[in-house]
Design a protein with these regions (language model features):
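Extended, low-polarity segments enriched in aliphatic/aromatic residues
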Residues: 2-39, 45-78, 82-261
């Protein structure tokens, strides 16, 4: 097992064993107990490219076993170009809701809150799923290369939070309105609305599972694909932006020491 500053990477043995060890080590249960809603956000492109059911189920079982007694758990995604509920059925996610009595949410058709933020780089405002704002959001991508976002990681996975009812074109089910500029900006602005609380990346094809805080573990994920994270446009932009936000926050929160003679 390899430790990172804000996460860890473990050699893949099986989904259940690797994920249990990793999440226990990182004491994720302590964070889960703070929330009344937990959202598992898998990646679904189509019926050939998606977060595996076995991977999702292992994270789900850990969350159910370690959540506070009243907390609800949901699986949520907003597919781009396809009907999300049909994909849930085709992939097999529906079986998890029946087995564990949890909810499935289509983020393309859910209640939204309009968010404005001076740190948005392209959008003037974003209609963001309200339930994500109220929940512990865990991003669960499967690591792979991607033609639009270069790689699929915990950050780019959050493109699913753009509801298609507000971001698709008139004659298309694709979320065309997030493609008016380079994708790195749409990823950045959706993360300004809310950065996932935590992420677990299925890098089993590369021999590992990675877990920890988004941005930091995505850098490790990029390395597993033989890439320098600085070359991944959305990851470099997020690193620079959120580092700057953290510095500003610390400057505002740190007590000022006044020296008198």
């Amino acid at each position: 097992m390899i430790f990172m500053v804000k996460g860890a990477l473990i050699k893949f043995s099986s989904y259940e064993d690797s994920i249990n060890k990793l999440l226990t080590l990182l004491k994720v249960s302590n964070e889960l107990k703070k929330y009344d809603k937990i959202i598992l956000k898998p990646y679904i492109a189509d019926t050939n490219n998606y977060t595996p059911v076995e991977f999702l189920e292992s994270v789900l079982k850990f969350c159910i076993a370690n959540k506070n007694p009243v907390a609800e758990v949901f699986i949520a995604e907003g597919s781009d170009s396809s009907d999300t509920t049909d994909l849930f059925e085709s992939i097999g996610y529906n079986s998890l809701t029946e087995k564990y009595s949890i909810g499935l949410l289509d983020l393309n058709n859910t209640e939204v809150e309009e968010i404005t933020d001076s740190e948005f780089l392209k959008f003037s405002s974003i209609k963001y799923p309200k339930i994500l704002l109220e929940s512990c959001v865990i991003s669960l991508p499967v690591l792979m290369e991607h033609s639009e976002t270069e790689i699929v990681d915990s950050l780019s996975n959050m493109l699913g939070a753009y509801p298609s009812q507000h971001y698709s074109g008139f004659f298309s089910s694709n979320k065309n309105k997030i493609r008016k500029w380079p994708m790195k900006y749409s990823i950045h602005d959706i993360l300004i609305c809310k950065l996932p609380n935590f992420a677990v990346i299925d890098a089993s094809k590369q021999g590992h599972i990675i877990a920890g805080l988004p941005i930091e573990i995505d850098k490790t994920a990029a390395k597993l694909l033989g890439k320098d994270w600085r070359s991944i446009q959305h990851l470099k932009l997020a690193h620079d932006s959120f580092s700057s936000r953290l510095i500003k926050k610390q400057e505002n929160e740190d007590p000022k020491i006044k020296i008198t003679e």
